[in-house]
Amino acid sequence: MLHFLSSSSPLNPQFLLLPRQSARLRVLLSIPVSAMSSSSSSSSRGALAAAAVPSLSADEAGAAADEAFLRYTSPSMRRSGGGGVAIVWFRNDLRVLDNEAVVRAWAASDAVLPVYCVDPRISAGSTHYFGFPKTGALRAQFLIECLEDLKRNLTKQGLDLLIRHGKPEDILPSIAKAVTAHTVYAHKETCSEELLVEHLVRKGLEQVVIPQGGASNQKKPRNPKLQLIWGATLYHVDDLPFSVNNLPDVYTQFRKAVESKSSVRNCSKLPPSLGPPPGSGLDEIGGWGTVPTLESLGLSMTKAEKGMHFVGGESAALGRVHEYFWKKDQLKVYKETRNGMLGPDYSTKFSPWLASGSLSPRYICEEVKRYEKQRIANDSTYWVLFELIWRDYFRFISAKYGNSIFHLGGPRNVESKWSQDQALFESWRDGRTGYPLIDANMKELLATGFMSNRGRQIVCSFLVRDMGIDWRMGAEWFETCLLDYDPASNYGNWTYGAGVGNDPREDRYFSIPKQAKTYDPDGEYVAYWLPELRSIAKERRNFPGASYIKQVVPLKFDGGHQKRDQQFNRQRRPGHMYRRQK
């Protein structure tokens, strides 16, 4: 994910021609998870209610956001005198705080026009290989909330958000012409579909002619320019101690190099006001437009009765940082709790806002440093930064290897035989594998759009190691469901887990019995998502035998966990054996 796009790399065909949707899958994504569970409503009584993340009220989150904005506002900032109109094209950077594209546009203009394009290839498109919906209802709703909050925060800063439904390469040139914009500012993306859109926008802007004031022999007409800015990572690409092409393939080597030889740039400051918007041209293009609804996107959703409900938007993101770091004081124990699976506070839960760009990784870093000065610095405070560096690593790896992170063989072009058995995959997708730890995690994903880091590793290992299913099916299903989906992290992690990425231990295997005993010893997590297990003794909830549905495959035997896996497999009902299709 950077400016390296191989001409031989295949692009998703929907970016050339929008494909037909899978009606069955889109209906599936509109069904509340409770309707997909075999348990009765009476068996779920007593379950913990859904928890909002953050748990702050809207007023509390807004106050935390206002305080953050105040700390990063500089009354001394002045425009550089560039004049004219600049457009800010919002993409995966749905925030005002530490948004360099916004600040650069403000500084270089007399008026700023923020624009967001609801691209049908994203909102209604299909995944490349298996045709799953590209955006499920849960993430769509989260993004809608992000747009609503972005619009509010821009209004507080003297602007507004112009929203259009359509392809950016069609919309932005027409808007630039209407408001006579000299530049479109946006944050740089790095994967092929996003890079193609950047290319098409640039070509479209080249066809727009903006007349200049004054005598014709003094000022020639010009074309609006596309100015792309790096701003999605903790470490800026220009500050790496190596070129992207020479990026270390092993995370530890990458981390040690950037920690010792690079520094994190400061968050950008804000002026007291980002206004005004353009004074003319908006009527010509139909006004500001409206934030989409699920219905307008052809989606529907029933509010989940349990699990976590993430609130979209920059204000909620800043509220969550305040809540987790300062109000609940959880940062100091993050490393000890991060492998949990149940509840909102075992980890930061920042990832959905990072993925949408509602939260800046540099802001998190500066808050960690502030916490270390005011409260405590320990392994836990460092570990939050450690995880942000992982996020950087996958983005830079995708920049280095381009589309290979989406290919079956991954960056290392590993040749392996994989099954694409649809029935077997659907048992994994729907949480019907017969292994409670797998099924509980998959039901959480369906209900909330979220899954713990530990859970993701376990269900990935099960799909690719125990089931032998094509890892891309899992990656594309995660693309559909995850609130925190971004291509670099999602596909980077899946290639890593499938043994086709940059993991030195390419045969990495997560034993379900070992994981269950270590991370859910009392079966609280599986009983929460699988209410039929609540009546079983705690020590047997992850190993329920005939009390639970039949296991669809035996576990892979590996030397380290063979005895445990044999014990687990003996609970299978006799006479059932899965044979992988050739």
Curated annotation (Swiss-Prot):
One Gene Ontology term, aspect cellular component: mitochondrion
**Basic residues: bias regions:** 570-582
Give the required cofactors.
FAD; (6R)-5,10-methylene-5,6,7,8-tetrahydrofolate
Which InterPro entries does the UniProt entry name for this protein? Cry_DASH, Crypto/Photolyase_FAD-like_sf, Crypto/Photolyase_N_sf, Cryptochr/Photolyase_FAD-bd, Cryptochrome/DNA_photolyase_1, DNA_photolyase_N, Rossmann-like_a/b/a_fold
Q: Quick one: where is this thing mainly located?
A: plastid
Domain of life of the native organism = Eukaryota
Task: List residues of the Photolyase/cryptochrome alpha/beta domain.
Answer: 84-234
Q: Which GO terms describe its biological process?
A: photoreactive repair
Q: Where is the transit peptide?
A: 1-49
The record's region (Disordered) falls at 560-582
Coiled coil region boundaries: none
Keywords carried by this UniProt record: Chloroplast, Chromophore, DNA-binding, FAD, Flavoprotein, Mitochondrion, Plastid, Transit peptide
What SUPFAM superfamilies does the record point to? Cryptochrome/photolyase FAD-binding domain, Cryptochrome/photolyase, N-terminal domain
Q: What does the cofactor section's free text say about binding?
A: Binds 1 FAD per subunit. Binds 1 5,10-methenyltetrahydrofolate (MTHF) per subunit.
Q: Does the keyword Ribonucleoprotein apply?
A: no
The reply on keyword Phosphoprotein is: no
What GO molecular functions are on record for this protein?
deoxyribodipyrimidine photo-lyase activity; DNA binding; FAD binding
Q: In which compartments does the protein localize? A: Plastid, Chloroplast; Mitochondrion
Role summary? May have a photoreceptor function. Binds ss- and ds-DNA in a sequence non-specific manner, lacks photolyase activity.
Name the family: Belongs to the DNA photolyase class-1 family.
Q: Which named protein is this? A: Cryptochrome DASH, chloroplastic/mitochondrial
Q: Which organism is it from?
A: Oryza sativa subsp. japonica (Rice)
**Taxonomy of the source species:** Eukaryota, Viridiplantae, Streptophyta, Embryophyta, Tracheophyta
